[in-house]
A protein has these predicted regions:
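Cell-envelope/extracellular polymer assembly enzymes that use nucleotide-activated donors
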Residues: 3-6, 34, 198
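A conserved acidic beta->alpha catalytic loop
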Residues: 24, 39-48, 67
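Glycine-rich, basic loop-to-helix element that forms the pyrophosphate-binding segment
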Residues: 65-82, 89
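Conserved donor NDP-sugar-binding/catalytic core segment of glycosyltransferases
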Residues: 99-135
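Conserved nucleotide-sugar donor-binding catalytic segment
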Residues: 147-233
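Short, acidic loop-to-helix structural element flanking the phosphoryl-transfer center
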Residues: 404-408, 413-462
Length: 1013
């Protein structure tokens, strides 16, 4: 009978690491599997280890090559012998988490996926384990269908290692059999390097369903002797280079046969990426001529110096976060692998199997306020307060014979406290039960533990302290897909509680088992762990997501923005219900696994998804609600979002728009570059062009001013500039030099006819796109661009800004008579490049307009984007928009969503974003290393490094805050980085920003000096 899963393990020279690999297979939770061990003529005696495992366990089968044929061929040999419905590959020096294959196969079966991808955890030789957050986020969606599978794979151009490796996947064998004939040419060759790409290109091309399973996967063990660690071995290095060239040639030919030209273009990007990466490594193993020869063979049209648009070498690998093993230990305990083998598994229900989208359970009561006011016929009492006080009274009034309260007890106490009617109590009891069912969601990690225990043949029981009745809880469990438990122990039915051990004792008595035969798993350290252990049970903690989110020893996410309004308002005022609900959503999303990677010195653990979802997403939601409210109040019928700042916000507005919002939206280009004809219409405005003159050279300046420059060869322009004393490629060192150059340009090189033609084209375009009654959205700030638009359209066009600069905007608003409405009443401390990078589209900028067939159309710059910046921007913005979608889907029609019409709530919702701008911890700032922010006008063609920019601005903001008397804040939250600062500056920094640390270090220093004396 065929197995469900076949796992192929090629073996060559890995005898030392082989036992860990094979043990991880032997102990897999999926028992219906076969393990095909391919001995590729391993020279180190590994065959004896394979034979021993095959002798002890019939699921292991050994296949032998008489001579070494390479990794690609060994995998093909194993795959040809496979019988399973699904297929997986595992390298013999790696190992797999205990429940990966069962969970991945289950996901594929439930959703008809062809491919399921798990996590990758890197293990160093010293045993330390870590994840690479960028790789973990490389797939934006956890489910892809149809051509979206192919598109997602090729668009990332092999930059994300985890996407194209074959050994962290489970593959439907029907898909493999379709792909296998294409592999035949390579199977005859000896290939050991990047063979994953050859397999994956074909698999992803034909796959129609892709799923992402999180929380389980493969441990990739780093070894200096591995196939990728060849820098110190020239012969091995040359062989690897040759393999890579063959793999890319194979992949390109396959795509050519399929007519997949767009995929081929992306593959060429990947080829350049690998050429650059290996050329860097080659410096250690080869001389320069040989590097050139090898690189030319791999990618003939590649230039190491010329391809500046390629991402920084290893950027995708750089941010690293420690992996935490808590959930893996729970899974192993359920399976009885680490000395404890309990036949009964007990699981808590609320916050272990079921989640609500709230930071605290009481927040659910706040969502019922509107229904309370209708049921109670309007009163001054808050339902959340009344409900909380009623439960406290009910517990105080319980008779000694009753252990726990019920809903009847609670609402009876409310009747006594407030004198509300039976009808009101009946309505609110019903409303609360229905709200619990409506808001509940499965906790994926908890459900996986439940299913794992069932698959392992354990008796699975549910144990809960809860006032809700059993029928309501069963409805919640069924909604969350949880069925088939073997016992349900509910405190108000059993008349016993967990905290004193009584409910645990009833459980063991009714099941007829000894306490040490039960493993209990729950989210509360005292009730689910300490109390269970006191009752004689084994117990393990699965931390509640919201508790992890709020724990500063795990993450600084909840602390973001706390210092932004310090001294102006209270902490409670900065935590309205909407923000608490946002925190609940974020906690459930990122800490569903209570041991998900997180560190105390970071907010996002360097995950772009966390930065996007929580920090950018909350601000995006607030901005969108503000815009809709303002447009409704101002009677705006057409709102035009200006590129590139408005692209993301427009999508959020469209998500939230209701029938009450009649505003029509559009999106048009309006860059500094394309508006230069209007910005320079008046000669007096030339001196205040929005440029950083210090980064410009005459060459760059004339490219910028090409729309109004005389027709002449570049050589002639250069000759005239240098003859006038302006060296062609020398930056302007002083503002006076820049001003002198502009005067020279106006006198010698300016063409008024060209300028007028460019102005007329821009005017025709904007008159059509901004008809009467239109308003604009732009990020801000000075009003120059809006003034230019008003000048071109010859009418006052209102504008909505995130914020204005407070000086020029007022002056220009008055001069050109356009109203300015700002989300923030004053400029925030951190603005500019980082804000725009997070919120703006990274599409190619508009550089001007041209006439085509009696129409004016925008002209865009060539797409020379940095792939790393593109990935980071897309990932952050995708998850920000997902937050808006989740918040709307969860809270639409409730008071939570309605509260976002309040400007104070909008401001509070933006504090995490402002905190991320100003207080980004250094561990998260690693995401910005070598990420350029490009502004063709402001910065010329120079790219601003975001990490450096953010560090400088946050330090300036911290100093300014201190000068204004702001309270102390933890040094790691304000951009002061002690590890990267000299002794004197470090001392001053601690004194200014972290006085407690300063005092501790001072005492330590004085004590050491005293001992030395």
């Amino acid at each position: 009978m065929a197995a469900t899963l076949s796992v192929v393990v090629p073996v060559y020279g890995t005898k030392r690491d082989l036992p860990a690999c094979l043990e991880s297979l032997r102990t897999q939770s999926l028992r219906d599997a076969e393990f095909l061990l391919v001995d590729d003529a391993s020279p180190d005696g590994a065959g004896a280890v394979l034979a021993e495992y095959a002798r002890r366990d019939s699921r292991f089968r050994v296949l032998t090559h008489s001579q070494n044929r390479g990794l690609f061929a060994a995998r093909m040999t194993g795959a040809d012998a496979a019988t399973g419905k699904y297929l997986a590959f595992l390298d013999s020096d790696d190992f797999v988490s205990v429940d990966f294959y069962r969970a991945a196969v289950a996901l594929a079966e439930e959703n008809d996926f062809d491919l399921v991808m798990g996590d990758t955890v890197w293990q160093r030789e010293n045993g330390d384990c870590f994840v690479r957050p960028v790789h973990a986020d490389c797939v934006l969606e956890d489910e892809l269908r149809g051509n979206a599978v192919r598109d997602a794979f090729f668009q990332q151009a092999m930059t994300c290692y985890s996407f194209h490796t074959i050994w962290n996947k489970v593959i439907r064998r029907d898909l493999w059999l379709r792909c296998a004939p294409y592999y035949a040419p390579l199977a005859k060759k000896h290939i050991v390097m990047t063979e994953d790409i050859a397999f994956s290109v074909v698999l992803y091309f034909f796959a129609q369903g892709f799923g992402r399973h999180r929380g389980d996967g493969v441990f990739y063990c780093e070894h200096a002797s591995s196939s990728t660690g060849a820098a110190g071995n020239p012969a091995k290095f040359r062989k690897n280079y040759a393999d890579i060239a063959q793999v890319f040639a194979f992949a390109d030919e396959f795509l050519h046969q399929q007519g997949a030209n767009q995929a081929r273009q992306q593959l060429q990007k990947a080829r350049k990426w690998y050429a650059r990466m290996w050329a860097e490594q080659a410096r250690k193993a080869a001389n320069q001529p040989e590097i050139s020869r090898l690189t030319a063979a791999l990618c003939p049209d590649f230039s190491l110096d010329g391809d500046a648009n390629l991402p920084e070498i290893f950027w995708f690998d750089q941010p690293m976060t420690p992996w935490r093993d808590g959930t893996e230990r729970i899974k192993r305990a359920i399976l009885g692998l680490d000395g404890i083998d309990c036949p009964v598994i007990s699981l808590d229900v609320f916050d272990t199997l079921i989640l609500r989208p709230f930071r605290t359970p009481i927040d659910l009561f706040h969502t019922l306020e509107g229904k309370w006011q209708r049921a109670a016929r309007r009163n001054m009492t808050s339902f959340a307060q009344a409900r909380t006080e009623a439960e406290s009274c009910a517990r105080a009034w319980l008779p000694e014979t009753q252990a726990d309260v019920t809903m009847w007890n609670i609402y009876s106490a409310m009747m006594q406290n407030l004198g509300v009617s039976d009808d009101c109590v009946g309505q609110m009891t019903y409303n609360e039960r229905e709200a619990e069912i409506h808001f509940c969601r499965p906790r994926k990690t908890g459900v996986q533990l439940f299913n794992l225990a069932k698959a392992a043949g354990k008796r699975v029981v549910l144990t809960s302290d809860m006032y809700l009745d059993a029928d309501t809880i069963r409805r919640m469990l069924e909604k969350c897909g949880i069925r088939g438990w073997d016992g349900f122990f509910l405190s108000n039915e059993q008349n016993a509680l967990k905290w004193n051990g009584a409910l645990y004792r009833k459980l063991t008595a009714q099941l007829g088992v000894k306490p040490d035969n039960v493993l209990h798993i729950g989210d509360n350290a005292k009730i689910d762990v300490e109390a269970a252990k006191k009752a004689g049970l084994h117990a393990l903690l699965l931390p509640r997501p919201a508790d992890v989110f709020m724990d500063a020893d795990c993450t600084q996410m909840a602390n973001l923005g706390h210092g932004c309004l310090a001294g102006f308002t209270t902490a409670d005022s900065m935590q309205p219900l909407a923000l608490r609900c946002a925190q609940g959503l974020a906690a459930n999303r990122f800490f569903d696994d209570g041991y998900a990677p997180a560190t105390a010195d970071s907010a996002f653990a360097a995950y772009p998804s966390r930065l996007g979802y929580y920090a950018v997403g909350t601000h995006l939601l607030a901005l969108a609600k503000w815009l809709l409210c303002r447009c409704r109040a101002d009677g705006v019928k057409r709102l035009v979002f200006l590129a590139r700042d408005g692209a993301l916000l427009r999508q959020a507005v469209e998500l939230l728009r209701t029938d009450a919002d009649a505003v029509e939206t559009d999106y048009i280009p309006a860059s500094r570059r394309c508006l230069l004809p209007a910005l320079m219409a008046n000669p007096t405005d030339w001196a205040v062009l929005p440029v950083r003159w210090a980064v410009y050279t005459p060459e760059k300046a004339l490219k910028l001013l090409s729309f109004c420059t005389l027709d002449a060869p570049e050589s002639e322009l250069r000759h005239q500039a240098e003859a006038a004393g302006f060296p062609w490629q020398s930056p302007f060192q002083q503002k006076t030099r820049w001003e002198s150059f502009l005067r020279f340009f106006r006198d010698k090189l300016y063409d008024g006819c060209h300028h007028q033609a460019a102005y007329s084209a821009a005017r025709a375009y904007y008159e059509e796109k901004l008809p009467e009654g239109s308003a604009c959205f732009d990020m801000g700030y000075s009003g120059r661009l809006q003034a230019a638009l008003c000048q071109l359209t010859q009418r006052a066009v209102p504008v909505y800004y995130v914020h204005a600069d407070g000086r020029n905007s007022e002056r220009l608003s008055a001069a050109y008579d356009f109203p300015v409405h700002c989300f923030y009443p004053m400029p925030p401390a951190m603005s500019g490049a980082f804000r725009e990078f997070l919120l703006s589209s990274d599409e190619a900028p508009c550089v001007g307009f041209e006439r085509q067939n009696a129409r004016v159309v925008p002209v865009y710059a060539q797409d020379g984007r940095n792939e790393a910046a593109h990935f980071l921007s897309n990932c952050v913005q995708h998850h920000a928009l997902q937050f808006v979608r989740d918040f709307h889907d969860t809270f639409a029609g409730t008071g939570v969503m309605q509260s976002l019409d309040n400007p104070g709530v909008q401001l509070a919702m933006s504090l995490p974003f402002e905190g991320a701008l100003r207080q980004l911890p250094e561990a998260d700032a690693e995401l910005l290393r070598n990420i350029p922010f490009e502004d063709m006008v402001f910065a010329g063609e120079n790219a601003l490094d975001l990490r450096t920019l953010v560090r400088d601005q946050s330090a300036e903001a911290a100093v300014a805050a201190h000068e204004m008397g702001a309270v102390d804040a933890p040094s790691r939250m304000i951009g002061f980085i002690p590890e990267q600062t000299g002794l004197v500056k470090r001392t001053i920094g601690f004194l200014l920003f972290d006085r407690e640390t300063f005092r501790k270090k001072l005492r330590k220093r004085m004590k050491r000096m005293s001992n030395e004396q």
